């Protein structure tokens, strides 16, 4: 199993950043190596990206189009970021691949597909905490929009997630706006209906609809993880290569004698050893 020195160096940089993120500390945001420093107006797309799919890329492309339209309207240029959290709300049970590998994979993908986009890393999973982290870490950010699918806005507006929903939403929308794309059968009309409810109307002006091609609305990272062979057309080439080379989503390989080899577990051990050795040499 070969890992280039360039990859080791990038992994080391990412690992150093991850070690700075403490889930028990106040909200933190860090910018990944090679990413532009956030300033002005930014769009942030938080996700687990496990793995990145063609839907993720299509959504980023649509957000880039939104940013260009905003610039034409005189709002100024907008920076685009994908974001991962060291603490993913409601997704803690998904363990592989390593967050380190996911960051590296996402970085490779963005460098080729969206060279002007960046990656942010958070220590918290809630949108309001991530918004606090952005404004604290990057005070030159004037306007923050979170990019998300329709299922997320339903959760955000659901009173069952809060002790005091309206107070929590006021805290969120004092710091950020939301850019919402259709998901599944829930399109722009569904979002309009949701925002027209009396309890949601006070917050409607902070929530913007992002048109999204229906061809991508049903694509799911979960389906790709569980049934990759059935969803090859939904997986970017760079991701297919990562999956093939690391077997991060594949079960252990069973040999004729009954023994099993977990190739991704071997990769994890190798990376831990390499990073430990590099750290000791400093």
Predicted regions: what they are:
Residues 1-282:
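Nucleotidyltransferase catalytic core that binds NTPs
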